[in-house]
Amino acid sequence: MYVAIEGVDTCGKSTQIALLKRRFPGAIFTKEPGGTALGMKLRELLLGGEAKSAKAELLLFLADRAEHMELVIKPALDKLLFSDRSLISGMAYAKGWDELWLKSLNLFATEGIVPDKVVILELTAKELSYRLSQKSHDSIESRGVEYLLELQERIKQMTALLGIPSLTLSASLSPEEIHGRIVSGFVLKG
């Protein structure tokens, strides 16, 4: 089973991945962007704001996604696989493009493979503002709360567009409570 953990920056994806690693030590864990050697280089470019045009940014994400699919996801499809982000985030971040065209491009990059299930960690504006105030920002986080809240909505929209079963949880719950809901209410149900 391929499970993607989605949400905007600071929502707790990394914390949940760490808890899932302890709970499922035999599972495969990856992230997007950056789940391959090429992906790490592309991630640095993307988070550093090196891509100045929206088209260049989109193409870098798609290159990472295709490489990640070939080297990490496809070989692990018969195992329990957790990914910190997926094509859903890539589509959500690619604002300003036709959604059906984005879907086609991303499905081309993934060879039609999408997560079996998606967990979306959702933040309120107040909680997001607080969490952002507690850390330094990369080029995406520096776009601000309004941008990230819009992105959060797009993550939900892209999940629906792809028709993937999802579980949306409040990221303001304790990490342990979120973890329990992911495991009992979603992952273990198969």
From Swiss-Prot:
Alphabetically ordered keywords of this record: ATP-binding, Kinase, Nucleotide biosynthesis, Nucleotide-binding, Transferase
GO MF annotations, alphabetized: ATP binding; dTMP kinase activity
Reaction equation(s) it catalyzes: dTMP + ATP = dTDP + ADP
Signal peptide per UniProt: none
One Gene Ontology term, aspect cellular component: cytosol
EC identifiers of the protein: 2.7.4.9
Pfam families assigned: Thymidylate_kin (PF02223)
Keyword Nucleotide-binding: yes
PANTHER family per record: THYMIDYLATE KINASE, UMP-CMP KINASE 2, MITOCHONDRIAL
Protein name per UniProt: Thymidylate kinase
Organism: Wolinella succinogenes (strain ATCC 29543 / DSM 1740 / CCUG 13145 / JCM 31913 / LMG 7466 / NCTC 11488 / FDC 602W) (Vibrio succinogenes)
Gene of this entry: tmk
